[in-house]
Amino acid sequence: MKLETHNIAVGAGLISLDVLIWDWQRVPISYYVGGTCGNVMMILSYMGWDAYPIARLDGTKDGMRVLDDMKKHHVHIDFVSTQDGKTPVIVQRNFINKDGLPTHKFESRNNIGRFYLDFKSLTLKQANGVIERIDFVPKVFFFDRVSPAILKLATTFKEKGSVVFFEPSSRGGN
């Protein structure tokens, strides 16, 4: 395994498609990579890092929009699968509140009651496949969701000398 001297980050967790809508238009005005992990990978790439998300998306139009946005912003998609995952969608509805100020709200269901936020974590088999294929040691491993596969990645990268950064997805009792 070769050691890299430049900044490389690997991330796992919530990578979604953010759909922004102005309330009075009722049609999407933009589609961007979102989710905590997705945002971190995009920001680090913008700052000159090599960013490698590890994710299970799907091959739908939403999944392809996520991949296209990542590629457009030089995020490496080597470890993003579109075979058996789901692409979470987060809808942000922008509007002017009663005081005349711009604000927004997030929606978790579509107009027929289906949840947008379908997230599928990596499997242990997929994590082991990434560990076998990866030929560098990242400076940072970032994650925002906990699963056996993501913990396996965190442990492996820590043992190789990476800084492991966990940002919990919510403040819960556990």
Where are these regions (language model features)?
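Positively charged, low-complexity intrinsically disordered leader regions
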Residues: 1-25
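Short catalytic helix/loop segments, enriched in acidic residues and glycine
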Residues: 24-42
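Alpha-helix C-terminal capping segments
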Residues: 41-50
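Residues at the starts of beta-strands that form the adenosine-phosphate
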Residues: 8, 50-52, 76, 162-165
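Conserved N-terminal subdomain of the carbohydrate kinase-like
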Residues: 17-21, 25-26, 49-140
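Flexible, charged surface loops at secondary-structure boundaries
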Residues: 2-5, 46, 130-138, 158-159
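Conserved beta-alpha-beta core of the PfkB/ribokinase-like small-molecule kinase fold
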Residues: 138-174
